[in-house]
């Protein structure tokens, strides 16, 4: 996904590009704003920008072409997602759900597009009356994943969708 695919947010996209070009990229960014403003789409396009360069960069380089191919399917090994999950009846009573429990459902949702709602995600997970949260086990898993060395030698990125649902 390229910045050009994000609706609006021109000033923010320009500022993000400028931070990268100047080498002043912080270790964490929080994208916040009203519901429906494309924060997730912006975060995902910025992750693509960091992992594979901008859309005008020469794509003939094998590493850039490879990164772009992985990002087309949102399967880049240095891009990780954390998101609210539910406890399914089939899970043991002591199991705290983590994002990897719902990786297939998440992948299906983001492949449909980067603009989606919590209701769409709940439906994708098969939720009935549960509340979706980001568990303590997810925080542990995130720490474990981010402690690993970058697979492709560049950035490691974690996108936490709806961090306000951390419990």
Predicted regions and their residues:
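Clamp-loader machinery-focused feature within the broader ASCE/P-loop NTPase space
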Residues: 2-165
